[in-house]
């Protein structure tokens, strides 16, 4: 099969994100190699901003 419209339906088969081994959330992008939630794989420091309200290791950090 080529690269047209029929092949676009095959994109949803594989998982884009898997469980991150640092934060435990299903946010680790396999193709890009980093976690969208904590920044693992891109930075040694935890991805954190003042405007967000997230959980680290399933514990709420404000």
UniProtKB/Swiss-Prot annotation:
GO cellular component terms, semicolon-separated: cytosolic large ribosomal subunit
Positions of Zn(2+) binding = 20, 23, 35, 38
One Gene Ontology term from the biological process aspect of the record: translation
Q: Does the keyword Zinc-finger apply?
A: yes
Q: Where are the zinc fingers (C4-type)?
A: 20-38
Q: Which UniProt keywords apply?
A: Metal-binding, Ribonucleoprotein, Ribosomal protein, RNA-binding, rRNA-binding, Zinc, Zinc-finger
Annotated GO molecular function terms are: rRNA binding; structural constituent of ribosome; zinc ion binding
| Disulfide bond listed as a keyword | no
Superkingdom of source: Archaea
Q: Which SUPFAM superfamilies match?
A: Zn-binding ribosomal proteins (SSF57829)
What does the UniProt cofactor note say?
Binds 1 zinc ion per subunit.
| Known cofactor(s) | Zn(2+)
Q: Which family does this protein fall into?
A: Belongs to the eukaryotic ribosomal protein eL37 family.
- Reported function: Binds to the 23S rRNA.
Q: Which NCBIfam families does UniProt cross-reference here?
A: PRK04179.1 (NF003214)
- Please give the name of this protein: Large ribosomal subunit protein eL37
């Amino acid at each position: 099969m080529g690269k047209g419209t029929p092949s676009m339906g095959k994109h949803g088969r594989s998982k884009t994100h898997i469980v991150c081994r640092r934060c435990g959330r299903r946010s680790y992008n396999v193709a890009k190699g980093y976690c969208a939630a904590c920044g693992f794989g891109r930075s040694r420091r935890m991805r954190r901003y003042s405007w967000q309200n997230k959980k680290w290791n399933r514990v709420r950090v404000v």
